[in-house]
Amino acid sequence: SGTTGFPKGVVLTHHNLLNNALAAAKAMKFTRWDKLAVPIPFYHCFGMVVSNLMCFSVGATVVIPGEYFRPEEVLFAIESEKCTAVHGVPTMFVAELEHKDFHNFDLNSLRTGIMAGAPCPPVLLERVMNEMHDREILIGYGQTESSPLAHLTKKDDTFDRRVNSIGTNVPHTEVKIVDPGLGVTMPFGEVGEICFRGYHVMKGYYNNEEATRQAIDENGWLHSGDLGTMDSD
């Protein structure tokens, strides 16, 4: 919402947000002993829910590198605070890896994190895992309308699965692939629109009933507007 059209306010509930944050924490095996570097803006659902609220839900530490994103501040925060995780969009990880002083920072404390917001090229994931020592980093997919996480890879997933898929839907939710024109469910491997249903679906668009009806059908399915395929597993 807002990327390709006029921005719409998304109404999310406490139930939406807290459960989505807990889903992220469980996927990352996060505990009160972990520390997360958060360079993502707090006004974005990724930073607000999947980062801050996720830490609050398990008592983990939120480390704020700076007022806005500077790669050197993120690297310094990870080293100085011994962060066990870092979140970001792919371009943030690229900026960190390409920083002229990257190899002067000790990032061995890193264990996990989430990369989301755009597709992750295989070479980038490989560098994050090997050069940043972030071996358990997860790939996430979603949108503000789904609180925001809808899909997430697992820490034990193979490299191929992490770069060639968006993982499985988060627990206690449903997903299906439908023909955008006919609305029928597509077979495994066939391209269609990704639809979600579950606790994470927004209450609706703020003061916009027409847009809400277009996004959420009578059976509670949120139509993402994105195309994808579903594997048998």
Residue ranges and their predicted role:
Residues L18-K35, C45-A85, H99:
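Conserved AMP-binding/adenylation subdomain of ANL enzymes
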Residues A60, S80-G88, L97-R161, E174, ...:
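Gly/Ser/Thr-rich phosphate-binding loop
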